[in-house]
């Protein structure tokens, strides 16, 4: 399993990707998100969110989370939800970054980007949904039994992904292009 020092980097990356993909698939199930069968418009949004997240990507960020947890003696499964939350934020950023107003990319991982597969407004809302879902996942008891740890995870992700982190970096990138 992931987190074992006897594994090669490639083996660890593959194992982390599989664990993360399975966790993301469960998190992004329609019933998991809505708690019940969704309305048709929510079904389209969830499909766009799944398009943004599932079916590709190296999953390096989840590997780093899982391997960091292993340094503290935690098994991979105990870090799976935190790793998935980080990947949800990453995929949200890609869904927004691909939009015509930003990088205007039409392909991601060999597939149409969210805005090309659906439309721009759906890509924006899918990205927004992924971002908020990441914080919801971190707040769940299944992520960690200690509420203080969950709050610390939420706070750390908010700082890293906000104006002083990833979003600020994207703004600098776009300003440099003008």
Predicted regions, residues:
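Outer-membrane beta-barrel proteins and related beta-barrel translocases across Gram-negative bacteria
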Residues: 32-37
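Membrane topogenic helices and adjacent juxtamembrane segments
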Residues: 7-10, 17-20, 29
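Mg2+-dependent prenyl diphosphate-binding active-site environment of isoprenoid biosynthetic enzymes
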Residues: 12-15, 25-28, 39-178
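Short, Lys/Arg-enriched N-terminal segments with co-localized hydrophobic residues
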Residues: 1-6
